[in-house]
């Protein structure tokens, strides 16, 4: 945000401008006859933020979710994702598939008809280089039975010293080394820490963190302890 007096009005104006830009893109696709053969995705990179005069609470931007940008709570990482592709994606369909942005490149390769993209685009001279993502094209196209699923999803934010890992409905958030466990099936706002009641699940998710984490002097986070 710029230094303006009416930050709420500026935010509303930015939303209106973005809406107009999306409309211009859609109109241009239609004018060129490409609207029926173009996959259009509207999404975001993170939840609401507070910097620069932003006021997430005023607009209710987090909805039913807790947390902000650079936090591992759902409000910081769960984002809108709208896909539009006439004659391919069923209008009005809803999916509860758990996926992440690194799934988009495999998805784009898949819908473009590129086979064996993992081998084609892996730099074998770089140790560990490869695709972490899974194509979500089957879900987009209504073929849920063919959809592969992640065993878990993982996040780190050094700015807030938080680590998050989700497996199914279980979500472990580590804040400055302290693990907190939530069951998103009945606690989407992440209010009730049930780590003490489920130490076995905590330990399973902590083991995932220790497997996924790579130490970095630039991006430091505090690892959790095992129960």
Feature locations, PLM:
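Sec-exported extracytoplasmic/periplasmic mature domains
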Residues: 27-34, 109-114, 141, 199, ...
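C-terminal cap/loop subdomain of S1 sulfatases and analogous C-terminal strand-loop tails that border
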Residues: 48-72, 89-93, 97, 102-184, ...
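Intrinsically disordered, low-complexity polar regions and short flexible loop motifs
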Residues: 187
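The substrate-binding groove and active-site-proximal loops of carbohydrate-active enzymes
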Residues: 4-17
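Solvent-exposed, polar/charged alpha-helical surfaces in well-ordered, non-transmembrane soluble domains
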Residues: 16, 20-23, 27, 63, ...
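Histidine-centered active-site microenvironments of extracellular/periplasmic hydrolases
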Residues: 3-4, 27-88, 100
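Beta-strand elements within well-structured catalytic alpha/beta cores of enzymes
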Residues: 15, 22, 39-44, 81-82, ...
């Amino acid at each position: 945000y710029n230094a303006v007096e009416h930050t709420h009005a500026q935010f509303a104006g930015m939303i209106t401008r973005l809406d107009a830009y999306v409309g211009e893109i859609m109109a241009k696709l239609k004018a060129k006859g490409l609207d029926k053969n173009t996959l259009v995705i509207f999404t975001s990179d993170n939840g609401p933020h507070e910097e620069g005069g932003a006021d997430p609470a005023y607009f209710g931007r987090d909805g039913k979710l807790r947390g902000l940008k650079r936090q591992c709570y759902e409000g910081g990482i769960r984002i809108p994702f709208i896909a539009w592709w006439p004659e391919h994606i069923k209008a009005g369909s809803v999916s509860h598939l758990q996926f992440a942005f690194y799934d988009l490149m495999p998805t784009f390769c898949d819908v473009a008809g590129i086979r064996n993209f993992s081998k084609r685009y892996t730099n074998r001279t770089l140790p560990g280089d490869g695709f972490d993502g899974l194509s979500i094209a089957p879900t987009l196209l209504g073929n849920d039975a063919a959809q592969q699923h992640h065993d878990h999803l993982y996040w780190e934010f050094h700015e807030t010293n938080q680590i998050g890992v989700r497996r199914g409905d279980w979500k472990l958030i580590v804040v400055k080394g302290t693990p907190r466990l939530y069951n998103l099936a009945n606690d989407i706002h992440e209010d009730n820490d049930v780590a003490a009641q489920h130490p076995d699940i905590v330990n399973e998710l902590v083991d995932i963190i220790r497997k996924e984490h790579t130490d970095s002097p630039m991006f430091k986070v505090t690892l959790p302890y095992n129960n």
